[in-house]
């Protein structure tokens, strides 16, 4: 399952082999997992690699997450609205669209816009007495989720009273954030901690993705254990060609260096929504210092010769 196959023209394949040899000679896989910032600029990169170990951390904390969700469902909650922007909302939306909301779980809405029509449409679909709002913001200071939280908190006060409104809110935020402080002051149902060393677009397998996934009834343990097997495959130092992460990254990099910097995403219908998350992940991660790879999601597929 954790493998990769590829076919490249001779000039790209030759460059790939050279790149893989350099990677292996410099022991770069081991250095990556040791968070060696010299693989990049030698600046603060080591402080942003928490995603390397997050799968095991999420597995270790899964029972606690599921206990909170069980209590929520036992209290009659059947609708969840996630309020977030960018990486904090993208992964939950992909998981919902891919796996669906399971029976006896909650229905998930994702609101990542302050467009009045979108807010009204979701508002009209809710039974507030049976709804929990999940405010997902790493910094806690992102304007849009805070505006949405204020709006729906007011609506919840109207629906269930000021004393009970906070019990219909959950926060996912990094420790020490303004949202954590506000959620504690209000008495939110629960506060799930983010990991400061994980950027938003890398947070899919942390609480930002796992908590909404548990709410819709996903088999999160199976999901994370599957991810953990890929972690193991990407951690191997046996050889660069045996490491699917190194191989994929090297192919994309070699192609980009030779002018093939448009990456068309071709996805099966069942995982089509994954393209939007990959698009953000790749564009935001590689688009630095005037260079980068341009991912294209949802583009009509053409003949091979149109990709040059």
Name these PLM-found stretches:
Residues 79-84, 132-139, 170, 261-268:
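Short glycine-rich or small-residue beta-strand-to-loop segments that form or flank ligand, phosphate
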Residues 45, 64-78, 122-131, 251-260:
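Glycine-rich phosphate/diphosphate-binding loops that line cofactor/substrate pockets in enzymes
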Residues 91-96, 120-123, 144-149, 179-185, ...:
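Short acidic, glycine/serine/threonine-rich loops at helix termini
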Residues 158-308:
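Active-site phosphate/pyrophosphate-binding segments
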Residues 85-88, 138-142, 175:
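Short glycine-rich anion-binding loops that position phosphate/pyrophosphate groups of nucleotides
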Residues 1-74:
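Extended, charge-enriched "interface" segments that sit outside catalytic cores
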Residues 50-67, 92-136, 141, 147-150, ...:
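Glycine-rich oxoanion-binding loops at beta->alpha junctions
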Residues 73-81, 86-87, 96-107:
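Active-site cofactor/substrate anionic-group-binding motifs, chiefly glycine-
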């Amino acid at each position: 399952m954790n493998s990769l196959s590829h076919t490249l023209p001779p000039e790209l394949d030759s460059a790939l082999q050279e790149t893989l040899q350099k990677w292996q000679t410099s022991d770069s896989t081991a250095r990556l997992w040791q968070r060696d910032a010299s693989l990049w600029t030698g600046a603060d990169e080591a402080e942003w690699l928490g995603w390397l170990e997050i799968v095991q951390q999420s597995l270790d904390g899964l029972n606690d997450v599921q206990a909170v969700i069980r209590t929520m469902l036992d209290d009659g909650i059947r609708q969840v609205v996630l309020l977030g922007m960018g990486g904090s909302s993208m992964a939950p939306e992909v998981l919902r669209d891919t796996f669906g909301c399971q029976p006896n779980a909650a229905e998930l809405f994702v609101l990542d816009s302050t467009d009045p029509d979108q807010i009204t449409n979701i508002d009209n679909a809710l039974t507030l007495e049976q709804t929990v709002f999940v405010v997902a913001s790493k910094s806690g200071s992102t304007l849009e989720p805070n505006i949405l939280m204020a709006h729906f908190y007011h609506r919840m006060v109207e629906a269930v009273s000021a004393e009970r409104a906070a019990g219909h809110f959950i926060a996912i935020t990094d420790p020490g954030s303004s949202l954590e402080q506000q959620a504690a002051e209000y008495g939110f149902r629960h506060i799930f901690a983010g990991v400061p060393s994980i950027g938003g677009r890398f947070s899919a397998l942390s609480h930002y993705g796992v908590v909404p996934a548990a709410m819709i009834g996903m088999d999160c343990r199976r999901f994370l254990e599957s991810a953990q097997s890929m972690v193991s495959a990407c951690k191997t130092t046996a050889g660069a060609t045996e490491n699917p992460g190194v191989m994929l990254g090297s192919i994309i990099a070699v192609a980009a260096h030779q002018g093939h910097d448009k990456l068309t995403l071709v996805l099966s219908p069942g995982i089509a929504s994954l393209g939007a998350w990959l698009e953000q992940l790749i564009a935001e991660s590689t688009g630095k210092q005037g260079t980068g790879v341009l991912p294209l999601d949802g583009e009509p597929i053409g003949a091979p010769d149109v990709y040059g």
